[in-house]
Regions:
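Conserved N-terminal catalytic core of the sugar/cofactor nucleotidyltransferase
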Residues: 2-5, 13, 27, 31-145, ...
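Catalytic-core segments of class I nucleotidyltransferases/pyrophosphorylases
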Residues: 101-110, 116-120, 125-134, 139-142, ...
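Conserved catalytic-core motifs of eukaryotic protein kinase domains, centered on the activation segment
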Residues: 16-19
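Conserved beta-strand segments of alpha/beta enzyme cores
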Residues: 24, 73-75, 168, 189
Length: 246
């Protein structure tokens, strides 16, 4: 399984701690936040991790080297030239996360070839299409902000996403109090965002009305898919803003 840790941010809300180090290396309970997340991912069965870096990137690279990458395959997405936020950062990491060969069956077929071949044999149409789509759904990635520590069961989150039909991204949210909420409809589909301090809303033109949506705080953890990666434009933007634009 594959994951990406967003560790490039400036950590402005953690100043003055981040004046001399990246937020990924802030220590909590005797371990850096980055170490907590890497070890939790490793324990959950993840064997490939991409980490994006920008602020004090040399410190993160040295930390990983000193710890032999904690015995896991870790690749670095370098944003030292320009901080890209979560959406742009994910797009830059595209080729580190997405390997087309992972979309093949054990027999070397793509999901599309499998669907076509078995339909030609006269097999049940719904069953074959579901098998092909199942292969595509299994190729997904867990995305995790580096400044989030949680008791989330990563295996259960991945299982939920992989066994949910027609879902391109699964966001981990909570009912905690905040000024900024994600807005969902009754089917738990993302429909908007609101800052209750300023009453700014997204997407443009959204009219917010109290009680019209289910309101949750984003927890900084999600699962996404190759389909989303293929749609991402280059540039600097939030992944949540991107979801609200499509």
């Amino acid at each position: 399984m594959k994951a990406m840790i967003f560790a490039a941010g400036l950590g402005s809300r953690l100043k003055p701690l981040t004046d001399t180090r990246p937020k990924a290396l802030i220590t909590v309970g005797g371990k850096t936040m980055l170490e907590h997340i890497i070890l939790k991912l490793k324990a959950a069965g993840f064997d490939e991790i991409v980490i994006n870096v920008h602020h004090f990137s040399n410190q993160i690279l040295a930390f990983l080297e000193a710890n032999q990458n904690f015995g896991i395959d870790i690749q670095i997405s370098d944003e030292t030239d320009c901080l890209l936020d979560t959406g742009g950062g994910l797009e830059r990491a595209y080729y580190l996360l997405h390997h087309p060969e992972d979309m093949f069956t054990k027999e070397g077929e793509t999901p599309y070839e499998l669907i076509f071949e078995n339909l030609m044999k006269g097999m049940d149409e719904e069953e074959i299409i579901e098998r092909g789509l199942g292969i595509m759904r299994k190729e997904c990635y867990l995305l995790h902000n580096v400044d989030i520590l949680s008791n989330c069961d990563f295996e259960s989150l991945m299982y939920y996403h992989q066994n949910s039909s027609n879902i391109n991204a699964t966001l981990l949210v909570s009912p905690r109090k905040t000024s900024r909420y994600l807005l969902f409809n009754d089917d738990n589909l993302l429909r908007g965002w609101v800052n209750k301090d300023t009453m700014e809303t997204k997407p443009a033109g959204l009219r917010y009305k109290e009680g019209e949506y289910r309101e949750y705080a984003y927890s900084g953890i999600q699962v996404t898919t190759p389909k989303i990666l293929n749609l991402l434009p280059r540039g600097k933007y939030s992944i949540i803003d991107f979801y609200l634009s499509i």
